[in-house]
């Protein structure tokens, strides 16, 4: 058992150090960390998470080339700008040839991981996707292929894995059933989403999950449950970003989530899962000009510049004001490198696979 004689039981210092040592805290202690932490305690937390990330990954930050292949979606999530019933969304779907051209450019720039992201588009069937993945694997055998395509059948996940995909991102968003029902349409089920996550792990994917911070109806207790679920599930990747409203959704007038709370959660998750691959998200950069670097300084170790065709980027509009150009874009790599250098980091061009 962790020896706590050097600090007062329940004190801030003890709480932080126990989290770093034991990789978990009690629900009540996590709650206090999220609600009562003074600015200096949050900074200590970020510093501890930063050091853990540095021990595991050095000063390198992995880059992934993000390609948003379709903004069609069969779902009607109440927070999402590409929800099915948003008739104002300008829809697009990239051809396999366009996706391959994006990968070609990304490979030339130095990317060795590609992330294919999409709404749950019924047109992206297994035949199309397996053909695309096989061709990517044939042309760039040294690259990792990450998918973020939503909920699919076990047979589909297996076919995509066997075609050559390595990783799969599927954020659960919230582990609280009532909150999940508030955010999502009736046809979507939290149980099914969690089942998908376990299926992905069973098949052999490096699996990622995560949460949206500050979504309408979310409580601190919901966040504590999310932290404990992630701790128990042990994902290889963790995606966490603030809720940002989209004007053409039922939640269009709700306030955005807190950058500070997102950074606190990011640091907690780094201490819980020291070797996890944790991106500093575009949503952080959208809400705060220095948000992406603040995410790195809170323990993140991945960034995902946008490789999508510039004409389509603004159409993959999950929320208002999305940062998709400048240092957020693949063509802004020099700016990204400068920003990282200013905080003592640099781009790592390796595949960046998960390693315990």
Where do the model's predicted regions map?
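Short, small-residue-biased leader/transition segments that mark boundaries at the very start
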Residues: 1-14
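Generic structural signal for well-ordered alpha-helices
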Residues: 65, 103, 130-134, 157, ...
């Amino acid at each position: 058992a962790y020896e706590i004689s050097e600090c007062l039981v329940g004190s801030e210092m003890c709480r932080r150090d126990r989290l770093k040592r034991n990789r978990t805290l009690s629900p009540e202690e996590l709650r206090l960390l999220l609600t009562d932490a003074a600015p200096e305690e949050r900074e200590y937390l970020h510093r501890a998470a930063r050091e853990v990330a540095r021990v595991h990954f050095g000063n390198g930050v992995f880059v992934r080339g993000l390609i948003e292949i379709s903004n069609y979606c069969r779902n009607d999530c109440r927070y999402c700008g590409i929800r099915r019933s948003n008739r104002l969304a300008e829809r697009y779907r990239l051809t396999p040839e366009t996706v391959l051209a994006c990968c070609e450019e990304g490979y030339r720039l130095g990317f060795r991981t590609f992330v294919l992201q999409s709404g749950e588009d019924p047109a992206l069937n297994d035949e199309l996707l397996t053909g695309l993945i096989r061709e990517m694997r044939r042309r760039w055998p040294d690259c990792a292929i990450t998918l973020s395509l939503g909920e699919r059948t076990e047979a589909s996940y297996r076919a995509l894995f066997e075609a050559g995909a390595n990783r799969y991102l599927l954020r659960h968003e919230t582990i609280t059933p009532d909150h999940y029902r508030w955010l999502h349409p009736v046809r979507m089920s939290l149980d099914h989403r969690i089942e998908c996550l376990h299926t992905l792990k069973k098949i052999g994917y490096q699996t990622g999950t995560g949460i949206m911070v500050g979504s309408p109806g979310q409580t601190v207790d919901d966040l504590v449950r999310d932290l404990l679920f992630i701790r128990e599930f042990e994902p290889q990747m963790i995606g966490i970003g603030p809720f940002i409203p989209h004007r053409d959704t039922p939640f269009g007038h709700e306030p955005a989530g807190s950058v500070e709370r997102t950074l606190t959660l990011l640091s907690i998750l780094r201490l819980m899962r020291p070797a996890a691959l944790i991106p500093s998200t575009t949503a952080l950069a959208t809400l705060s000009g220095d948000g992406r670097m603040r995410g790195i300084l809170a323990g993140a170790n991945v960034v995902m510049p946008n490789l999508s065709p510039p004409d389509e980027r603004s159409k993959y509009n999950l929320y208002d004001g999305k940062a998709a150009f400048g240092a957020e874009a693949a063509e802004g790599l020099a700016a990204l490198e400068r920003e990282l250098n200013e905080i003592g980091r640099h781009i790592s061009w390796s595949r960046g696979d998960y390693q315990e």
